[in-house]
Amino acid sequence: MIQAVPPPDPAVAEAVRAGRWAEVRALAATLPRPLPPALALVTARAARTLGEPARALEVLRPALPRAGELAAAMRLEGAEAALALGQDPWPYLAPLLSPPSPAPHRRAAAACLRRAWQTLPLATLQGVPRRSLPRSLRRELAVAIAVRGGNDAAALHVLAERVNDEAALRAAQWLAGRQGFPTTTRLAIADALLVGGAWREADELLAALPPPIEPRVRFRWAFLTGRAAYRLGDLPRAAEALDRALAVATSDEERFAAAVQRARVAEISGDEASALGLWDAARAAQPREVEGWDGGLRLRVVLGRAGEAVGLVRGCPAPVLRVVGPRLAATLLLRHDPARARVVLDRIPQKLAVARTLGVALLLQTGQVEAARSAAVVLLADPRAGAWREQVLALLPPGAEENQPAPPTRDGEVLARIAARRGVAAARAALASALAADPAWDRVLACAPPEPTGWTGAAHDLAEVGLEREAASLYPFAFPDGSPEELAWTARTLVVWGNPPAALSAGERLWGRLGAVSAALLPEALLPAILPPELVAGCVAAAREQGAPVPWLVGIIRQESRFDADAYSLAGAVGVAQFVPEAARRLGVTPAELKDGDRALRLAAREVARLAERFGPRLAQVAAAYNAGETVVASWLAEFGSEPEELLLIAAMPYGETSGYVLAVREGVWLAGYL
């Protein structure tokens, strides 16, 4: 803990915030030495910004040993000054990259190193102690050295290690323009491009290759060609390539992979009979994998062979049944076949939240409304049920006690009973009344939490000298969180000071202080504290401009990136809206432009509005299409019906990732209900 010192002159902070660095330097010159760490930091920044990086280092070196918690901020400033002098920033950044360092410090140090590697001499990069780097940075350094040094072998080594990160995509994009590689190497490059979302580049690379002769190489060429065509929406060409892959497959693994991809193409194309045969072929090749079972069971129901599907379940391996069983039961309920759905549900472990949720749907479909309410109460009170709880609430019909007032309560089980029997509005009102009577929560509900008194530490010291952005980005963990009121202040302050993901986390921690309360039961007055208006302001503006439902866009962005403009996924998706490179091309922007948060939000809002126009006012379909693609979702609706019950559609979705995604988006929509 830094020892208490007199607060700095407010004029210093005002000058820092306004970027008047000459004034900062002049004010600092009048202060007694030694300078407190925060003032030493802004003095050094003033020197660096005014073109005196050597002077900045002179200020930082004596201050660093007594910097305490501010050492990370001072090391980062030292690294920037070293870079300005053309020096290697590694000596300043190395301590911040060790595992004990807080994640924000590691991220900031990594970002500084990435910039340094673009400009420092190649010899300097080659001298970086790679073993001291985290694995991801080690790979990025290898790519930087390979690209700048024209070293094909080093770039290929990055691909040989793994293909699902940003370093692999950068290496593959560079290698794609190089010449003289054998076919097997070209295929490895194409694979990395596909995984990284650069589908068109992969397709062009594959199209330039002559058909290989050796069976295993020919299989990989045909399979990757089929995947690229599928991703680009060219289903006839995908089918042709995948048929070639199936014809030359020499192992069960190859037959499984090709059959799964070819079955998806057939199903999307509306050829259910062929798709069923392909799903069965996948199941025969790999009977302990989910995909073959799932597709075969689903299409048997679609083709009117539900009894056969239920019979097959008896031979399903237990780990597979946990996944495909709920999907089959949901598909049967979508077809209004509760008797067979019950048979399937009886074979599924009832501790699964989705199985219990489908049990409520089954009871309602068979007219057992009171039994359904009782089952819903148990589910609603169980935090392990997650976002399935909101889906159950949407299922329940109004009861005789609907909207009747309930006494104030914060008890999760009591709130569950109120919601199931008197409705969501009554449960919200009961919780709101209980919180309003609690001094720890009343000011949170009023949306006016003041700055906590007695707040100290690194983040506070940085804010006192006008470095609020650094306080939020480097020390979000040092913000007050002792009481609900402090958490509400922290959530709003973090976003105002420039750290939206940390603000979202603080708001969600505030929600967690209520225990196992579903998002649907949160009082509207509490929602701005959990999801601050400043956090979603960009979404609100973009959605209104593009004609998209505001809560839908908020829910999607919350799930896609947690409002992080620098987010990058293993699938190559970039930025706050998580578009892949091919989507950027379709939308008329470059991948680099997707890192512009406001631009990306407008593009996302346009996509949501377009999908809503295609699928109508149905959040599940729109969110699923944003995640899995509209062609895929259209094929599901062709099988499940154009207006399926939302809960059943989510549970029946063949893609587990998409099902979870839609549930999370729906939860976010509840949180954004005040907008």
What do these predicted regions represent?
Residues R322, V343, Q350-A353, T357, ...:
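Catalytic glycan-binding domains that act on GlcNAc-containing polysaccharides
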Residues A13, R45, E80, R115, ...:
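Residue-level recognition of tetratricopeptide repeat
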Residues P7-A26, V42, T49, T184-E201, ...:
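Alpha-helical segment of the N-proximal tetratricopeptide repeat
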Residues A18, L50, L85-G86, L120, ...:
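Structural motif corresponding to the intra-repeat A-B loop/turn of tetratricopeptide repeats
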Residues I2-P10, R33-V42, A67-E77, G86, ...:
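Generic helix N-cap/helix-start motif at coil->alpha-helix transitions
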